[in-house]
UniProtKB/Swiss-Prot annotation:
Further details from the record: Has few direct interactions with pyrophosphate. Interacts with the substrate via divalent metal cations, such as magnesium ions, that are bound to the pyrophosphate.
Protein name according to UniProt: Pyrophosphate-energized vacuolar membrane proton pump
Positions that bind substrate: 246, 726
InterPro entries: PPase-energised_H-pump (IPR004131)
Intravacuolar side: 1-6, 112-131, 213-215, 309-316, 379-397, 469-474, 560-569, 657, 755-762
Disulfide bonds: 121-128
Name of one Pfam family that matches: H_PPase
Assembly information from the UniProt record: Monomer.
Keyword Translocase on entry: yes
Assigned keywords, A-Z: Disulfide bond, Hydrogen ion transport, Ion transport, Magnesium, Membrane, Metal-binding, Translocase, Transmembrane, Transmembrane helix, Transport, Vacuole
Similarity comment: Belongs to the H(+)-translocating pyrophosphatase (TC 3.A.10) family. K(+)-stimulated subfamily.
UniProt organism field: Hordeum vulgare
Length: 762
């Protein structure tokens, strides 16, 4: 038996979750002390008010009431635009939730003809609860997961729009103060999301347990709906937010920077507010929902496999909750790690920012390895058995620790390889920048080659972690490796959210007409944020591959498939169709960004041509029209990709059966991961090649610049092509592979009973 008793588990998990939420609120309270509203005395000429505290001595001349007012106005415009978009999207997503909840109930309830009689359990002796009740609880957990995901995304966006202007104003004190404000704000989102995800899942398990009692097989099967709800909302957040942000970004860049030769975030550009809104709805709300979905799904996959292993059969609640205990330890580890950035060390110069963020990843991974070792010793029996395709495999507690540790360190390796290929501090991006000498075509060729090459090491890291974890603990080992990769999610999310907050802060500084030296500081924050955003995408894609495989294993077990035979025609046709789906999905999202950007370009050109004095800065552009174009386009364009992902498992499972569906899932996983990594890294490299030329921090960079040169224009074109790759198609693909797998798992009993209708008549 485990050292940690059931009572200890019941205390430890919610306490860690609550500590995470309290820490998030404390960070928010500290950020809120930075005031964006000028004091009453600040309007008086020469008045010495509190705002004098902001300014470093040589910039005392900037103690200007108007700067603070402008920052507040811009922040309000960005916040209102983001809120408006999310509420519009949530109306459509709400309708989808209701319809899909009804489908879950009808499909799963029909397995035993809506009977209320108990049935013999599949994997353990005894009677399990009726399928009708499992259908009801699966529907409830789907709605809970969906609502938690939506609330997490919304709160993340609210925090980011609350923090952006505060980061700008703190930049007047120095780069260190601005960094801490942006990072604390990111930490609010990271801890709020990871802690609330854990607490809601734990409460759901305990509430469902009141009904299910000893039927843990049915209990954890119904919990899988939580992962499906979280990930389906993430799909719409990522795709809708990605289309929104990139339509605005491409439109603003093409007309503003290439045609009109005005700087990024120039207030004369009509698309500039839409562009800044997009950073929040795509990179904050979408990314938060994405990682929440990964966490929920890997937990569900581990719980489903554990419920039919010795943990579930022997009703060992502490060992059963091992995935949740790992996440609980992760919250405490991330809390300690965050203090290193905010309290123990101070950033004094711009070149200290990126190392500080990288240290966060290394410290959290090292501490988490120790934490997992301790919890594996306390929570797991010395020996236990894990379900492995019809047989039980004996595993030790240290074996399972090794599975989690392999996933944890594989995530760090993927993160740093991603950084190597996307940071302009290293030769790959510098080579891409150098290729701009001969125009945009060579820039595109070099960027694509970099993206394809960047797939190699992450895939080997994923392959090694799959082989090691499967050899030790079968599919449960893979699920725990995925959870290991996601165990430092609070720190990962804090670093990820820091990027868009810094980006917005730079935009606000430019629009408020602040000193170029303030802009240099926000640019330094943004440059580090760009690299860490690429690292975050690497984590998301790597964890998605492991999560998808773990869900695939749970689906195959639940559907009663003994072996997936690639030589079987039923499986093979699924395999090649599944491998095609990421291309179809990417085509839809890329085209959506392109068509939305076309409308945006036309509108921006129209305003420059028809509004007198706009180019001279004497007239204001119509920001609202551009915001509306992005909102309408993203809502309309997110439906077809969403339908493709949600309907494919239902159609394939019902018409062709579980064997073909298992082929589709395997094919989508194999091709989707490769495209996602290459798309994200290609786009990230083009973006940083452009920034490398703009910054001109080395002799080589200065030989390619300055802004407005032919080299720079070629780099801007590459960056514009890369925008939808790195922020729409690439990140959305990891949701495609996870979502199809978790949906197949939820509907597995229905497909096993009624699936393969077409083959029955052929």
């Amino acid at each position: 038996m485990a050292i940690l008793g059931e009572l200890g588990t019941e205390i430890l998990i919610p306490v860690c979750g609550v500590i995470g939420i309290v820490f998030a609120v404390a960070q928010w309270f500290i950020v809120s002390k930075v005031k964006v509203t000028p004091g009453a005395a600040s309007a008086a000429a020469g008045a010495k008010n509190g705002y004098g505290d902001y300014l470093i001595e040589e910039e005392e001349g900037l103690n200007d009431h108007n700067v603070v007012v402008k920052c507040a106005e811009i922040q309000t415009a960005i916040s209102e635009g983001a809120t408006s978009f999310l509420f519009t999207m949530y109306q459509y997503v709400g309708m989808f939730m209701v319809v899909f909840a009804a489908i879950i109930f009808l499909f799963l309830g029909s397995i035993e003809g809506f009977s209320t009689k108990g049935q013999p359990c599949t994997y353990s002796k005894g009677t399990c609860k009726p399928a009708l009740y499992t259908a009801l609880f699966s529907t409830a957990s789907f709605l809970l997961g969906a609502i938690t995901s939506l609330v997490s995304g919304f709160l993340g966006m609210k925090i980011a729009t609350y923090a952006n202007a505060r980061t700008t104003l703190e930049a007047r004190k120095g780069v260190g103060k601005a960094f801490i404000t942006a990072f604390r704000s990111g930490a609010v989102m990271g801890f709020l999301l990871s802690s609330s995800g854990l607490v809601v899942l734990y409460i759901t398990i305990n509430v469902f347990k009141m009904y299910y009692g000893d039927d843990w097989e049915g209990l954890f099967e119904s919990i899988t709906g939580y992962g499906l709800g979280g990930s389906s909302m993430a799909l719409f957040g990522r795709v809708g937010g990605g289309i929104y942000t990139k339509a605005a970004d491409v439109g603003a860049d093409l007309v503003g920077k290439v045609e009109r030769n005005i700087p990024e975030d120039d207030p004369r550009n009509p698309a500039v507010i839409a562009d800044n809104v997009g950073d929040n709805v795509g990179d904050i709300a979408g990314m938060g929902s994405d990682l929440f979905g990964s966490y929920a799904e890997s937990s569900c996959a581990a719980l489903v496999v554990a419920s039919i292993s010795s943990f579930g059969i022997n009703h060992d609640f502490t060992a059963m909750c091992y995935p949740l205990l790992v996440s609980s330890v992760g919250i405490i580890v991330c809390l300690l790690t965050t203090l290193f950035a905010t309290d123990f060390f101070e950033i004094k110069a711009a070149n200290e920012i990126e190392p500080a963020l990288k240290k966060q990843l290394i410290i959290s991974t090292a501490l988490m390895t120790v934490g997992v070792a301790v919890i594996s010793w306390l929570a797991l029996p010395a020996k236990f058995t894990i379900f492995n395709f019809g047989a039980q495999k004996e595993v030790s507690n240290w074996g399972l620790f090794f599975c989690v540790a392999v996933g944890l360190w594989a995530g760090l390796i993927i993160g740093f390889v991603t950084e190597y290929y996307t940071s302009n501090a290293y030769s790959p991006v510098q080579d891409v920048a150098d290729s701009c000498r001969t125009g945009a075509a060579t820039n595109v060729i070099f960027g694509l080659a970099l993206g394809y090459k960047s797939v190699i090491i992450p895939i080997f890291a994923i392959a090694v972690s799959i082989y090691v974890s499967f050899s030790i603990a079968a599919m449960y080992g893979i699920a725990m490796a995925a959870l290991g990769m996601l165990s430092t999610m609070a720190t990962g999310l804090a670093i990820d959210a820091y990027g868009p907050i810094s980006d917005n802060a730079g935009g606000i500084a430019e629009m408020a007409g602040m000193s170029h030296r303030i802009r240099e500081r926000t640019d330094a924050l943004d440059a580090a944020g760009n690299t860490t955003a690429a690292i975050g995408k690497g984590f998301a894609i790597g964890s998605a591959a492991l999560v998808s495989l773990a869900l695939f294993g749970a689906f195959v077990s639940r559907a009663g498939v003994k072996v997936v035979d690639v030589l079987s025609p039923k499986v093979f046709i699924g395999l090649i169709v599944g491998a095609m789906l990421p291309y179809w999905f990417s085509a839809m999202t890329m085209k959506s960004v392109g068509s939305a950007a076309l409308k945006m370009v036309e509108e921006v050109r129209r305003q420059f041509n028809t509004i007198p004095g706009l180019m001279e800065g004497t007239a204001k552009p119509d920001y609202a029209t551009c915001v509306k174009i992005s909102t309408d386009a993203s809502i309309k364009e997110m439906i077809p990709p969403g339908a493709l992902v949600m309907l494919t498992p239902l159609i394939v499972g019902t018409l062709f059966g579980v064997e073909t569906l298992s082929g589709v899932l395997a094919g989508a996983l194999v091709s989707g991961v490769q495209i996602a990594i290459s798309a994200s890294n290609t786009g990230g490299a083009w973006d940083n090649a452009k920034k490398y030329i703009e910054a001109g921090n080395s002799e080589h960079a200065r030989s390619l610049g300055p802004k407005g040169s032919d080299c720079h224009k070629a780099a801007v074109i590459g960056d514009t092509i890369g925008d939808p790759l790195k922020d729409t198609s690439g990140p959305s693909l990891n949701i495609l592979i996870k979502l199809m797998a978790v949906e197949s798992l939820v509907f597995a009993p229905f497909f096993a009973t009624y699936g393969g209708l077409l083959f029955k008549y052929i």
